[in-house]
Swiss-Prot record:
Induction line: Expression is under control of the CSY1 amino-acid sensor. Expression is induced by N-acetylglucosamine. Expression is also regulated by CPH1-mediated RAS1 signaling but is independent of EFG1. Induced during biofilm development. Induced upon internalization by host macrophages. Expression is down-regulated by growth in alkaline conditions. Expression is also controlled by the nitrogen-dependent GATA-type transcriptional activator GAT1.
Membrane-related topology note: Multi-pass membrane protein
Source organism: Candida albicans (strain SC5314 / ATCC MYA-2876)
Keyword Cell membrane applies: yes
Effect of a null allele: Decreases two fold the citrulline uptake. Leads to defective hyphal formation in solid hyphal-inducing media and exhibits less hyphal clumps when induced by N-acetylglucosamine.
Protein name as annotated: Amino-acid permease GAP1
This protein's encoding gene: GAP1
GO molecular function, a single term: amino acid transmembrane transporter activity
Any one GO CC term of the record: membrane
Chief localisation class: membrane
Length: 582
């Protein structure tokens, strides 16, 4: 049974400082210096009050450490909602869609993004249910250890860490290339350093400033996407400077599909990867000031982001840009000149706006770089708390920053200085990306499986869903559906890796596309050998459903939910529909 706890203000009193005269001036520097000291203990989540006086098992220690994290809850509702909306609106949408259009054609990319959107929505619903009930450090990384078994948590956690660890220098390179849109003679290294310093400052200011920065970045991205959709409708209807009615012109010629089924499979993989980062909302749960109300709203925002921002943009791109446009050929995740957003505006005869779109792409690059440091540092901190990474990497200072994890990630970002200019180093960089290339798919699969096992444990242990502050709208079957689609992604990636579009089968392309599979298997097997633990999964009756749970008075919770339902029942049907999705 869960119990409501009294708030302990002891540490609030300790942090108060004099505010008069010279004391205020010296107090600022003292506060900065003191902020790097070890964190003060935080209030515990439920399930950790009565620790048995015996040697703990690995899974018990993992659950208890995650529930006692010293990360600070400073993210507000506005931060979570914008992070949920904008966490994956980046170069994957603004640039990566160009390559998918060239490979698959307009119908293929619309279908691919629609299928991926459904998959992500189902997965995020299950993740939301877990994250609201268990707002612990590490999020889905911890859920894999808690509801599946620690070996899977180890493999998924380290692969997720590596994915975003390598992403920071990639985004810095993308930022430098974006600048060259205006002046090709500019030295890339100068802007790599500038962008790196901006990311360093934001991430070192703490989680609250990360939230504020993302609020600004995401607002700009959202405005840009909505503006592009409106502009796209105008251009399609012939309202542009060229006064040419486009309609379904490019769907008829050159046609709806390119490269038949193989092109569609390739587009499906690109679509899935473009949603990478959506799951990051779960990492914010342990630093949210109001998990009970803020996180469900943020999770529901996924629906609107998918429908409006992604599918809306994809339909505009598919209608305004022919898939055989030569500017799309050879497009990559960092080549902004191949952005279908830019091409669509240029084709429409509009001057000036391409520079605006590229400025938005530049902001997206900074946003994703900023988010990559956040994801990497929190994941590494969680792994350290679980005993799966060196203990010192989990150091949290008094400002609530996983300090060493942040510094490690930012220092590695300087690898972009090498990757920006040296072709041989770029090859090595691509192989580093390949190591974790399928990390998002594995992470989503672990979320699906964790939710399925959580629901199974609830049933076996005779626990009611009324205990949960938030219940997935898609239920447990949504997680089964998401798991099935994620398995299909792996099959499609294997197929495309073995038989690449427009090329002959070769070992280089195959391993570049599928290296993530043997890497994650090796990680899992390595953990088993290291721990000498050959348990394949935790039995449902043995899954700990209490440690790390949010502090909730169950009677009060059920009363609040009943009152909310009663009030909603009195509203018009359109309000009820809105509240269901928002």
């Amino acid at each position: 049974m869960l119990h409501k706890k009294e708030t302990n203000d002891t540490f609030v009193q300790l942090n108060r400082s004099p505010s008069t005269g010279e004391q205020k001036s010296s107090g600022i520097w003292s506060s900065i210096k003191d902020s790097f000291k070890p964190a003060l203990p935080q209030d515990k989540l439920t399930g950790v009050d009565d620790i048995p006086d015996r040697e703990l098992t690995d899974i018990e220690r993992i659950n208890i450490n995650a529930a006692n994290s010293n990360l600070q809850r400073k993210l507000k509702t506005r931060h979570l909602q914008m992070i949920a909306i904008g966490s994956s609106i980046g170069t994957g949408l603004f640039v990566g869609t160009g390559g998918a259009l060239s490979t698959g054609g307009p119908a293929a990319i619309v279908l691919a993004w629609a299928i991926s959107a459904i998959s992500v929505f189902m997965t995020m619903q299950g993740l939301g249910e877990l994250a609201v009930a268990f707002p612990v450090s590490g999020g889905f990384n911890l859920y894999a250890s808690k509801f599946l078994e620690p070996g899977i948590g180890f493999a998924v956690g380290w692969n997720y860490f590596l994915q975003f660890f390598v992403l920071l220098p990639l985004e810095l390179v993308a930022g430098a290339i974006t600048i060259k849109y205006w002046n090709a003679s500019i030295n890339s290294d100068v802007f790599v350093i500038i962008f790196w310093f901006v990311v360093l400052v934001i991430t070192m200011l703490g989680v609250r400033w990360y939230g504020e920065a993302e609020l600004v970045f995401c607002t700009i991205k959202v405005i840009a996407v909505i503006g592009f959709i409106i502009l796209g409708i105008v251009l399609i209807c012939g309202g542009g400077p060229n006064h040419e009615f486009i309609g379904g012109k490019y769907w008829r010629e050159p046609g709806p599909f390119a490269n038949s089924f193989k092109g569609f499979a390739s587009s499906l993989i690109t679509a899935a990867f473009s949603f990478g980062g959506t799951e990051m909302i779960a990492l914010t749960a342990s630093e949210s000031s109001n998990v009970r109300h803020a996180l469900p709203k943020a999770i529901k925002q996924v629906f609107w982001r998918i429908v409006i921002f992604y599918l809306g943009s994809i339909i505009m791109i598919a209608t305004l840009v022919p898939y055989n446009d030569k500017r799309l050929l050879g497009s990559s995740s960092v080549d902004v000149t191949a952005s279908p957003f830019t091409i669509a505006i240029v084709n429409g005869g509009i001057k000036g706006l391409p520079s605006v779109i590229n400025a938005v792409i530049l902001i997206s690059v900074l946003s994703v770089g900023n988010a990559s440091v956040y994801a990497t540092s929190r994941t590494l901190n969680s792994l350290a708390e679980q005993g799966m990474a060196p203990k010192w990497t989990g150091y949290i200072d008094r400002a609530g920053r996983p300090l060493f994890a942040i510094l490690i990630t930012n220092v590695f970002g300087l690898f972009a200085l090498i990757a920006a200019d040296n072709e041989k180093q770029v090859v090595a960089f691509n192989w580093l990306l390949a190591l974790s290339g399928l990390s998002s798919i594995f992470t989503w699969m672990s979320i699906n499986l964790s939710h399925i096992r959580f629901r199974r444990a609830m049933k076996v242990q005779n626990r009611s869903l009324t205990e949960l502050p938030f219940v997935a709208q898609s239920g447990v079957w949504g997680s089964y559906f998401g798991l099935t689609l994620n398995i299909l992604y792996l099959i499609a990636q294997f197929y495309i890796g073995l038989f690449p579009v427009g090329g002959k089968p070769n070992a280089y392309d195959f391993f570049l596309a599928y290296l993530g599979v043997p890497v994650i298997l090796a990680s899992w097997i390595g953990y088993k050998i290291w721990k000498r633990d050959w348990t394949l999964f935790i039995r449902a009756k043995d899954i700990d459903l209490d440690t790390g749970r949010i502090n909730v008075d169950l009677d009060l919770l059920q009363q609040e939910i009943a009152e909310e339902k009663a009030q909603l029942a009195e509203k018009p049907f359109y309000i009820r529909i809105y509240r269901f999705w928002c």
